[in-house]
UniProtKB/Swiss-Prot annotation:
Tissue spec. comment: Expressed consitutively in roots, leaves, stems, and flowers.
SUPFAM superfamilies: HLH, helix-loop-helix DNA-binding domain
Location of this chain's protein in the cell: Nucleus
Domain of life of the native organism: Eukaryota
Gene3D superfamilies found in the cross-reference section: Helix-loop-helix DNA-binding domain
Gene Ontology BP annotations: intracellular iron ion homeostasis
GO cellular component: a single term: cytoplasm
Gene name per UniProt: BHLH11
Organism: Arabidopsis thaliana (Mouse-ear cress)
InterPro entries the UniProt entry points to: bHLH11/121 (IPR044579), bHLH_dom (IPR011598), HLH_DNA-bd_sf (IPR036638)
Subunit structure, as described in the record: Homodimer.
Biased composition (Polar residues): 270-279
Keyword list, A-Z: DNA-binding, Nucleus, Transcription, Transcription regulation
Stated name of the protein: Transcription factor bHLH11
């Protein structure tokens, strides 16, 4: 009926189950740790690979830059350092140009100030000159109003003495203001001198005739001497008439050539004066 209860005892199977459970837990932990180690190793390998790739690319880039510089040295650089250096150089050039332009502006402004000052001085000088010109014009007008009119100048002829012995070709020159009036005066002088010469010849012939007649009457000589005296008188009268005809012809020529120079008029008057004493001397000879 009722059986007594027996105590439970651990058998080998129980021990086996416990060991299996503990081993499974430890194996799971080992697997997790191995996975973590594998992941860390993978990450390290990837980083190393990226670094190696970067180094390779940098090396290739440097090689390509060297090759490009060797092929085309004027080719613009595209790296950051070259760009920065180029910009810095450009800024320096721009600053130098700005300084140069500032210096030029200063010099030009100084020159402009000097020119403005000179322009003002020239304006002042122009104003003073204008005032001086106005004053001089006023003085000139005043003098013209108060000035006495000048008497017109009359040209007088220069007298000269005719040389009878050793006639020279020298003719005195008289500078005159009005040559027409001088020519008219020379013609009048020539006509007056010729008229005086003819009057002198007539006055000299008449006393000679009277003297000859008186001498012929008082001498008491014959008719032969009277005839000789008459012939001499006729010859002298004929010579005087020829001289008068020459003088009248020369006067006509002078009247036709009124536009001739003063030297020709003087030479004609000299010729007339030279001829008239010769005729008188011829008449006075016995």
């Amino acid at each position: 009926m009722d059986q007594p209860m027996k105590p439970k005892t651990c058998s080998e199977s129980d021990f086996a189950d416990d060991s299996s459970a503990s081993s499974s837990s430890s194996s799971g932990q080992n697997l997790r740790g191995a996975e973590m180690v594998v992941e860390v190793k993978k990450e390290a390998v990837c980083s190393q690979k990226a670094e190696r790739e970067k180094l390779r690319r940098d090396k290739l880039k440097e090689q390509f830059l060297e090759l490009g510089n060797a092929l085309d040295p004027n080719r613009p650089k595209s790296d950051k350092a070259s760009v920065l250096t180029d910009t810095i150089q450009m800024l320096k050039d721009v600053m130098n140009q700005v300084d140069r332009l500032k210096a030029e502006y200063e010099t030009l402004s100084q020159e402009s100030r000097e020119l403005i000052q000179e322009k003002s001085e020239l304006r002042e000088e122009k104003a003073t000159l204008k005032s001086d010109i106005e004053i001089l014009n006023a003085q000139y007008q005043h003098r013209i109003k108060t000035m006495v009119p000048w008497v017109p100048h009359y040209s007088y002829h220069i007298p000269f003495v005719a040389i009878t012995q050793g006639q020279s070709s020298f003719i005195p020159y008289s500078a005159s203001v009005n040559p027409l009036t001088e020519q008219q005066a020379s013609v009048q002088q020539h006509s007056s001198s010729s008229a005086d010469a003819s009057m002198k010849q007539d006055s000299k012939i008449k006393p000679l005739d009277l003297d000859l007649m008186m001498n012929s009457n008082h001498s008491g000589q014959g008719n032969d001497q009277k005839d000789d005296v008459r012939l001499k008188l006729e010859l002298k009268i004929h010579a005087s008439s020829l001289a008068q005809q020459d003088v009248s012809g020369k006067e006509k020529k002078v009247s036709l050539t009124t536009t001739a120079s003063s030297s020709n008029s003087y030479s004609l008057s000299q010729a007339v004066q030279d001829s008239s004493p010769g005729t008188v001397n011829d008449m006075l000879k016995p």
